[in-house]
Amino acid sequence: MKLKMNKACDIASISVLPPRRTGGSSGASASGSVAVAVASQPRSQPLSQSQQSFSQGASASLLHSQSQFSQVSLDDNLLTLLPSPTRDQRFGLHDDSSKRMSSLPASSASCAREESQLQLAKLPSNPVHRWNPSIADTRSGQVTNEDVERKFQHLASSVHKMGMVVDSVQSDVMQLNRAMKEASLDSGSIRQKIAVLESSLQQILKGQDDLKALFGSSTKHNPDQTSVLNSLGSKLNEISSTLATLQTQMQARQLQGDQTTVLNSNASKSNEISSTLATLQTQMQADIRQLRCDVFRVFTKEMEGVVRAIRSVNSRPAAMQMMADQSYQVPVSNGWTQINQTPVAAGRSPMNRAPVAAGRSRMNQLPETKVLSAHLVYPAKVTDLKPKVEQGKVKAAPQKPFASSYYRVAPKQEEVAIRKVNIQVPAKKAPVSIIIESDDDSEGRASCVILKTETGSKEWKVTKQGTEEGLEILRRARKRRRREMQSIVLAS
């Protein structure tokens, strides 16, 4: 187990011994002046330069260093009072004492201490030097007191650091003891388990030996029993193999039965789906046929109403003469119609409806005998119809069938050519243009019935009323047809 040491408690960084002093004379001739300079030099500078590092030390070494320091200070004071030759001798003694202090045993011998050098101020060679004993004594006393205080401070810090080190070591020792106790407990439990295992192994070995002995005795006394046991074992093996084969066969048959049931259920479901689809198809076809018949009937009724409104507008004393071709709506393949327009006498255009196969009807329109210029009007979106105007006769080109899925609305205005009839009236009356358009808004179909006139007399009012009636009829037809289409879409 690793001991966690505190970095601040490094023993090598603690030192209680005083720093080593070094000093020397400049020569034999200037020994007096150097001694005076040493005596008058303040003690704070060398002491501040020499204090660098401290290590662990005992109280005896501290007392010894203090006694040495006091002796050195007394030697310095006496040196200042003696004459120059004596001072020289005492100065030599001071050097010896400093050397002796440096040779004291230190606890921090491992760490390198830096030696501070005392810089002595070289005074000018003056034979007369006055010395003030009172100032020197006070300065030396202050220096010694400061040095002692610093020593005590460093000693207290070193003791504090040593206490921290001891605390950390104590905590590490406690942790080590705790770990040792836990390890001892674990080892005791492991030993108990090992003992139990050894006893169980011994019992197992004894049981094996007993079984071997019993088997050997049984084989020796009854040799026929071994053959019987072998035959019984072979029979048991055969029975187990037959049971396994039977089990596999049963599983295979069960899987086949499940597959047949699944196939039967799928076939029944497919039959149900096909029957429902067939019924839906027949029902949709019947609904489509009925819808075609209803739409065609409604459309023919609306067209008859529009024609009646136009007749009421045009039936005046000075009736205008119109020319149009007789139109027949004949069912053709793909549900389209052919339109033939031929003139009819009596100034009217009656409509004759005759039932035809597939619920269709044939419509004959007989306009007046006199032929006037007539023009076809097509909406902007229509691209399939291409009219041909030749000498007042109009023929509509057949349209291309739409790509519808199930059904197509019975022949309406998109199958009948849209006619624009310009009616010429006698003088003093402006021509009236009647535009008959379909009620469907999709491509290839017109949207309304428009009557145009240029007069401001009573004829304008009549034509306006006819126009409004025709528009109202077309709106109703549109609404009815939209409702029927929505109901068909929802039912499908």
UniProtKB/Swiss-Prot annotation:
Expressed in reproductive organs, but not in vegetative organs. It is found in: Nucleus. GO terms for biological process: chromosome organization involved in meiotic cell cycle; embryo sac development; megasporogenesis; meiotic DNA double-strand break formation; microsporogenesis. A motif (Nuclear localization signal) lies at residues 479-483. Its main location: nucleus. Residues 166-186 form a coiled coil. Keywords: Coiled coil, Meiosis, Nucleus. Disulfide bonds: none annotated. It comes from the Eukaryota. GO terms for cellular component: nucleus. InterPro entries: PAIR1. Interacts with CRC1. Involved in spore formation. Plays an essential role in the establishment of homologous chromosome pairing in early meiosis. This is Protein PAIR1. It comes from Oryza sativa subsp. japonica. The gene is PAIR1.
